[in-house]
Structures are given as structure tokens and as C-alpha cells.
């Protein structure tokens, strides 16, 4: 309710406002979107998004933002909606209560948009938490009626692979992080010109992403929700992460 109260206030105000839905500002998503808009993959049909890392473990302090599928997953819920260009229509979520924690820390949701585009979103901070050498699996795989566009990254470098009807291209550039600089440039440009840059996300977009992320997460609770593993393993994960110098999503020590 508070989210929509903010939306109402900002939309009635006579000033620009925005929010950092940072994936929209990522160079790789912009490149893929342009490729799709050029008709290179035909009609957009399938959106597949995955983000699995040994990141923030349950109980480490982000619960006020919700379990992982809301705290982190809402950004992937948003970017799927951004690509589809319309609202969600149907969904089904499956979760796993890893280490027998009370909330699912891995969720996959699949369904459809109102225009018929099919999606699946997989998110979880459960990927090899106690592996000797940690890794992750993060990708976007977009399938059209004629071609494809996909992306992978290692948090340092992003690689975009474009296979269209007239173009084949591989682009490799620095990953880019949270893209605050891009957001600031777009906002400054809007102020200077007096016209809102269409690339700026609306506060409404954030509220919608948050609402659907909660909806998809809650849907997982309505289906079989296996509890796999033991809390003792989670305690080992906490201990390891407390002492890690280089890891995924480590909390800042005071």
C-alpha cells in the first residue's frame, strides 16, 4: 500500500521522478532490445531469465526486503515485463526451502504475458554455497520466431550473442554494475531538456515489479514446497560467509 501511495504522490507532482531498475540501463539489455526492435529475431516468443549465485544467505539481514525472489528477483520480474512490453497474465511458481529454512531461497516462475509471450524466471542464492571455488549461473535467453538473442556474464564481463535473420554479432564489454551513472545521466538530460527521457523507469514500474515478485513468491507457497537439507548446513554457510574476503553479496562489516 505504501508503494502505491508513493506512486500516487510522484505522479501528481510537477517534477521528474525515477527509480533505479538498474537492469534496464545495462548496456547488454539495451543492445538486445534494439536488436529485437529491428525485427532480427522475428516475433518475440519466449523469455528465459536465470540468476543463481551463492549470494545473500537466508537470515543474513535482508528479510525486511523479503526473501531472495523479492529482494533480488523483482529486478528480473521487471526486465521480463520490459522486454514483453505488456503486463503479466498467468503464472505458476515452484520453490524449494533449501536447508529447511522457513522461506524458499530458490524459486522458478513460468507463465505468460497478455500478448502471448511466454516467460520463465529462475532466481536463487543457493548455487554452490559451500563449494570450494564458488561460481554462478546468470543468463538471459530470448527466443523469437526467426532468431535469438542471449547474454551471460561473470560480474566483470558481459557477453551478448545475437543471431538474427540478417545479422550475427558477439559483443563483449565490462559488466557495468548497478548503472547509477547511466541513470544520473538520463535524469540530468531530462532536467536540462525539460522532457522526460523515455528510458527513465517510472516509480510505477518499480511498484508493479515489487507487487508481481511478491505475487509469484506467494504462489510458490500454494504448491508443494519441499524442505531439503538441514539448518546445520545453513549455519556452516553463515560461518563461511562471515569470514570470506571475496564472495557474492557479502554484507559490509561495521
Question: Model-predicted segments: where are they?
Answer:
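A contiguous active-site-proximal alpha/beta segment in oxidoreductase catalytic domains
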Residues: 1-58
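Alpha-helical elements of Rossmann-like donor-binding domains used by nucleotide-donor carbohydrate transfer enzymes
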Residues: 5, 27, 31-34, 79, ...
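Short glycine-enriched, charge-decorated loop/helix-capping segments at active-site entrances
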Residues: 63-67
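Glycine- and charged-residue-rich phosphate/anionic-cofactor binding loop of Rossmann-like
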Residues: 167-173, 190-208
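Short arginine-rich
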Residues: 212-222
Amino acid at each position: 500500500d505504501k508503494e502505491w501511495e508513493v506512486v500516487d504522490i510522484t505522479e501528481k507532482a510537477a517534477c521528474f521522478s525515477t527509480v533505479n531498475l538498474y537492469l534496464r540501463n545495462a548496456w547488454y539489455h539495451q543492445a538486445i532490445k534494439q536488436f529485437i526492435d529491428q525485427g532480427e529475431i522475428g516475433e518475440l516468443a519466449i523469455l528465459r531469465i536465470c540468476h543463481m549465485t551463492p549470494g545473500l544467505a537466508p537470515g543474513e539481514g535482508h528479510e525486511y526486503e523479503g526473501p531472495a525472489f523479492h529482494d533480488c528477483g523483482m529486478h528480473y520480474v521487471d526486465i521480463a515485463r520490459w522486454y514483453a512490453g505488456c503486463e503479466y497474465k498467468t503464472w505458476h511458481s515452484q520453490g524449494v526451502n533449501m536447508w529447511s529454512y522457513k522461506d524458499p531461497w530458490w524459486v522458478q516462475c513460468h507463465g505468460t504475458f497478455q500478448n502471448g509471450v511466454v516467460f520463465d524466471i529462475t532466481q536463487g542464492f543457493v548455487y554452490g554455497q559451500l563449494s570450494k571455488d564458488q561460481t554462478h549461473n546468470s543468463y538471459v535467453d530470448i527466443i523469437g520466431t526467426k532468431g535469438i538473442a542471449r547474454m551471460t556474464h561473470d560480474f566483470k564481463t558481459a557477453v551478448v550473442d545475437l543471431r538474427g535473420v540478417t545479422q550475427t554479432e558477439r559483443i563483449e564489454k565490462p559488466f557495468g554494475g548497478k548503472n547509477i551513472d547511466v541513470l544520473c545521466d538520463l535524469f540530468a538530460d531530462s532536467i536540462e531538456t525539460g522532457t522526460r527521457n523515455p528510458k527513465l523507469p517510472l516509480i510505477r514500474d518499480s511498484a508493479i515489479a515489487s507487487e508481481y515478485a511478491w505475487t509469484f513468491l506467494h504462489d510458490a507457497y500454494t504448491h508443494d514446497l519441499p524442505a531439503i537439507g538441514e539448518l546445520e548446513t545453513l549455519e556452516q554457510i553463515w560461518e563461511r560467509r562471515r569470514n570470506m574476503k571475496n564472495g557474492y553479496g557479502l554484507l559490509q562489516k561495521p
